[in-house]
Amino acid sequence: MHRTMAVTAVLVLSAAGAAHAWGGLFNRFSSDMLANLGYGRSPYRHYPYGQEPEEVYAEALEGNRLDDVIDEPGHCYSAPCTTNGDCCRGLLCLDTEDGGRCLPAFAGRKLGEICNRENQCDAGLVCEEVVPGEMHVCRPPTAGRKQYNEDCNSSSECDVTRGLCCIMQRRHRQKPRKSCGYFKEPLVCIGPVATDQIREFVQHTAGEKRIGVYRLH
């Protein structure tokens, strides 16, 4: 009797051990088995369980955890530039001692305030000398602004009332040069452009090229 019970106990323990071993082999969790629940090879397998990608994106925005955001194209503060279009939003290509640089749109100096450079004055104002060799102030452009195809360094030198701004001209087999030209978008210009001063209808002088003139809408 005791021998029979011992044999039975050994058989039970052996069966339990075998079952545990087979379970360890076949009862393993596979993420592919739950592909529709946020795991496995579904398109959203990289997102936390139970969250749609839109929810994760919103949380990342709130927590400022977007590490892989691609920087806005174009140059940024104080970077070299040729036209306004080369700069980030809110910056303009301004002429400096080191050439064109992306700088804040307007320095904000008002009419009559002392200035040192053209780009220190608000749009529509130019930095002009009032005491030779000593003092410059911001004032409206005087008569005699540069006309079509005349050399320039900044758009404030050109007659904006006729739709002109300072543009980098590139012609075949010629060295690039800055000159006053007609424009449709201020992005092609160099420096601040007072578009509110442009006359709606511009009369062309004889010999000027009839290219598209900027018009207010």
UniProtKB/Swiss-Prot annotation:
Residues 22-208 form a propeptide. Keywords: Cleavage on pair of basic residues, Neuropeptide, Secreted, Signal. Residues 1-21 form the signal peptide. It is found in: Secreted. It comes from the Eukaryota. The keyword Secreted applies. GO terms for biological process: neuropeptide signaling pathway. Its main location: secreted. ITG-like peptide: Expressed in corpora cardiaca (CC), corpora allata (CA), antennal lobe (AL) and gnathal ganglion (GNG) (at protein level). Expression in AL detected in all animals, expression in GNG detected in most animals and in CA and CC detected in few animals (at protein level). GO terms for cellular component: extracellular region. The keyword Transmembrane helix does not apply. This is ITG-like peptide. It comes from Agrotis ipsilon (Black cutworm moth).
